[in-house]
Amino acid sequence: VVKQIARAREINKAHTTFIDTILKHSHKGRIHAEINQLRSDVGGTVTGRFSYANPNLQQIPARNKELGPMIRSLFIPEEGHTWGCFDYSQQEPRLVVHYAALDGLYGVQEVIDAYKDGEADFHQIVAEMADIPRSQAKTINLGLFYGMGKNKLQAELGINEDKAKDLFKQYHNRVPFVKTLMDSVMRKASNNGRVRTWLGRRCRFDLWEPNQYGIHKALPHEAALAEHGPGIRRAYTYKALNRLIQGSAADMTKKAMVELHKEGITPHIQVHDE
């Protein structure tokens, strides 16, 4: 009974969240969503990834093996055309390795060597390096890539503070290049107020906060000086690696879409790494 209730809820959510929304925005059998390529007053992401609205086509389920294909099958190609679906394999982890290799960081060569196997799995590689389960390695990897704090990472892992400290220490000792890269990119953001993505696009850190820890509203420089005095620092620099990696992934994906268009293939939608 419990499984049937859960399934009913899942189907109802798919119907109300996806199908009804798609039909609401259908015009002569077509969907013309609002596409935000960069951050603006009406939407978009700070990293430069695409976002969609009215409807949000990125919310179409993909992981549900039954409902995902059913909903996707509602979208049909033009007559005489065929859909193609392409996605990157471990795009963001590979970018982390790329930037760590550019700086010649200690420990990254082991991952580079492992990647010579086309089927290599970054999270499994790191799990073996750190001697921890793959699930924990993946949680820590993604948490660090996305600028997740220690407390949130601990909660995601579902372990107590002492175990978390031991686990993080073991991870950083055996996979040192991730934290080294994270700290390096953070320093660049703090010193320069920006980091540059793969294609040279600037991700700016223009807001400021007081040096002391606590919950503070990030402000423009002059406002932060007036509010807190000279003891201020750039805000959100802990997310610098995330901006670099996601921003570079966005560059790479958009460049690929342009190249596809040049070859006569029309990109219709981009969802995450697909």
Which residues fall in each region the model found?
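Conserved catalytic core of nucleotide polymerization and phosphodiester-bond processing enzymes
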Residues: V1-E274
